Amino acid sequence: MTDRVIVGLSGGVDSAVAALLLKEQGWDVHGLFMSNWEEDEDGYCTAAQDFQDARAVARELVIPLHRVSFAAEYRERVFQHFLAEHRAGRTPNPDVLCNREIKFGVALSYARRLGAARFATGHYARILHSPAGAELHKARDAAKDQSYFLHAVDIEYLADTLMPIGELEKGAVRERAREAGLPVFDKRDSTGICFVGERPFREFLGRFLADRPGAIESPEGERMGTHRGLAFYTLGQREGLGIGGRPGHAELPWFVARKDGARNALIVVQGHDHPLLFSSALSTGAMHWLSAARREPFSCAVKVRYRQADQAATLEPHDDGSARISFEKPQRAVTPGQYAVVYEGDRCLGGAVIENVEAVSARRAAA
């Protein structure tokens, strides 16, 4: 049995320290740099610089570095779904699909062809092993935990994966990198999706989706303006609505509360805590369980977006594999297309795409 481990080296400090720790543990470490998006002429995607940084890390650690492009697979398996969801008026999370289809799909298969016994990443999460099998747990650093993005990966793939920085705080990761002389110890963390980069999101989306203007309306049907297309907005959004002060309305900001696809209308409300922004429950698509599927209702914690605090809820499984999740407290801006991820303590049980939400009554939202 080989003791080779392939580490996904992104050019950032987290994966660099993951490689460092594994080498210190005696593994035969190889780095793998993945290009998942063709860098454009505007320079928003930083893949070229990231590769140079990954190469510098590999040189410092004296480990081989393999470079491979999964751009075609990414476009087919992740980006096309991303566009289709936006066309349908939903708000997808491509990072979840990227982990399932690319990092723990084609990249893991590629690592095995390179003779790896294990695959490793710089994710802030923990894989724990028990007699019952592998489990996905939150990272020690709650502020950096990335288990939300990993819930859709098959547990047998996670079982063969090492995530050595999941036990560390971010500050300790940077300190280890500095002590080891890794050139990326002070590199800024990447933000957003590579193919969007630092550019305005709607500017990027407009390169692929045509405008489809329609009415911006109040819940009572009053026309408040014109939107560019439902694909360019998400629930809870405040910026970019173009609604100023209006006679007969309070001096409060406007927020997107709902998308009416049948009429191509964007429904907006005033006030951050308007009741129409809150949901008491949601319905999911097919649940992806990281352990045996639950058959009976049970109490759990749920996140409906990354970095959200755990929310107390009850999950009711359905015979078709979907579920209904009802919240102890109303949740703001629960968004179809995003993911509801389920936890028991620090353990991630799985999750699913949010399909529909149930509005909360004005009385309960104010409670």
Indicate residue ranges for each PLM-predicted region:
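AMP-forming adenylation/ATP pyrophosphatase catalytic core
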Residues: 38, 120-128, 132-367
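ATP-dependent adenylation/nucleotidyltransferase module used to activate substrates
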Residues: 1-151, 162, 171-172, 256, ...
